[in-house]
Each structure stands twice: as structure tokens, then as C-alpha cells.
Amino acid sequence: MNVSVTAPAKAAVAPSCYDAVTIWLHWTIVVLVAAQWLGAELIDFADRPTHKLYWSIHITLGCLFAAVVIFHVIWRMTAGRKLPTSNEEGWKLATAAMHMLLYWIPLILALLGIGIVLARGWSLFGIVNIPMMPGGSRPLSREIHEIHEWTAHVLVFLATGHALAALYHRYALKDGVLRRMQFER
């Protein structure tokens, strides 16, 4: 009797990290948030001509930031790899809330930035003139700017908390969560 035994089929292994596009978008947003926040904090130390140049750079990077954030949200809703939460049951709601805030606040921040520019008008690098919207004014622009600035501080605070949570997973829990945002080797 000839009995043939085959090896059991390998079980499908769930991916342990996000896809490359998601990872690139994540780290691009991290760099843009850090650069934009730090630049905005230092911008008022510049002399007048340099000050206008720095604002033009901030506005340009803000437009790039808005585009990347919008693409990131669309990517995550459609093609991006979904991984299950690694947190215990009690932390799942907090994790979901943090991630929702980290998606929505950058969108709100970008819209506020656009509102600032449209409320007062701007000459971008002295080349492109963005006109003031009807009903716009410098006082309105300043009010929107105040909200934009506070929203940026909230984003940096939450992003710092997010980073600290990732480090907690890495060094205290040692559960491999931080590896999810590293490129596969």
C-alpha cells in the first residue's frame, strides 16, 4: 500500500506592517508637521523681507501638507493595508479616537491655513498673487490665524502623545507595534 502524505498547507500569515505607501505618507506628514510647526514658531524672528519669504515657504509647504493629508486619508480609506489594533480591549476606543483626531485635525489645520490666505490675500514669493476673498479682512485673517495656531499646537501635542505611545509599545510592552511603521526588509 502506497500512502502519500502531503504537508499541511501553510496558513496565511497576516502582514505585520503597513504597506509602503502608507508608511511613506505617515513619515512625510511627520516631517511636514515638524517643519511647519517649528518654522511657524521661528518665523517672527526674521526681518521684514525674510519674514515674507518664510511665510511664502510656510504657505507652499502648507499646500503640500494639505495634498499629502488628503491623499493619505483617501489611501487609508481605499487601498491602504488595514491592521488590527494591537491594544487590549480597554484601550481600543482610546486608540481609535486618537487615530481619528490625527486624521481630522490635519485636515482642519489645512482648511484654516487656506482660510487665512483667502481672508487677507497674499503675494506668494512676489510671483503669484492670491486675491482676498469677498468679505475678507486682516482682522478676519488674524482671527482664523489664532485658531490655526492653537489647532497646530493641539496637533503637535497629540502627535507627541502618539509617538510616546509608540515608544511605550517598543520599550515597555515590547510587542512589535513600532515595527508596523518601518519598511519591510
Question: Residue spans of the language-model regions?
Answer:
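Membrane-embedded alpha-helical bundles that constitute the cytochrome b-like, heme-associated redox core
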Residues: 1-185
